[in-house]
Amino acid sequence: NTLNGNNYGVILNGIEAYGNLVTGNTINDSNYGIRIYNDAHDNNLFSNTIQDSANFDIQLGESEDTISFNNTFSTISVDSNANMWVKVYLDLTVYDNSSNAFSNADIEVKENSSVLYSTDYFGGSDDRTDVNGTIETFMVAISHYNGSSEPDDVTTNVSVRFVDWIISGTYNVSNSLSFSVPDFRVQNQNNGNMFYSIGGAISASSPSNG
């Protein structure tokens, strides 16, 4: 849809305005491109272009947990009792050092302290990486307008583990993350077990290993 020259391009008003998906619109020359207020909540703005608004491209009054994905806008007003999450789809891939897909790796993804994805090693029930070295794609927040027209950054914490090798870090996600599991192996000569780190081999050794 293309909406031109309106007072409001899109308006979501009241507590019954929830769970809506506003997507694929071009909104030009409005006073307010999109306005959400008066206890509207849990609405989704996907792939809209809002431009040349007289006041604000997006105006959030009293409203909770609006989600923004792939929207183009330049001006926003967020009241003290409103918030909006800006999100992207996270594509996570695990490789070996030869750039081959690495399957069966454990993954944990946290948004700040909230767990979004967790395999059994990390206490969850989500799937490990598949034959393509990937997990299912899902949304993570990259910024949060929380009672302010200036967003706060949201960090994504990711841990990847295979056998005794593990890496954990904090990332500012754009849309994809990739991790490389080292190719080298360390063998415990006493029992023949292979390890992905020297530390793992040492930890599993006994005094009789010499």
Where are these regions (language model features)?
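Consensus "Asn ladder" position of solenoid repeat domains
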Residues: 1, 20, 25, 43, ...
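Glycine-rich beta-solenoid repeat tracts in large extracellular/virion proteins
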Residues: 8-16, 32-39, 52-62, 74-84, ...
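Extracellular beta-strand solenoid repeats
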Residues: 11-13, 21-26, 35-37, 44-46, ...
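Extracellular beta-sheet/turn segments enriched in Thr/Pro/Gly and aliphatic residues
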Residues: 83, 167-185
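A short, amphipathic beta-strand motif
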Residues: 90-96
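Short, ordered, surface-exposed loop/turn motifs in non-cytosolic proteins
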Residues: 98-121
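Acidic Gly/Asp/Thr-rich repetitive segments characteristic of extracellular carbohydrate-active
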Residues: 99-100, 122, 134, 184-210
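Short Pro-Gly-centered beta-turn/loop motif in secreted/extracellular proteins
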Residues: 120-159
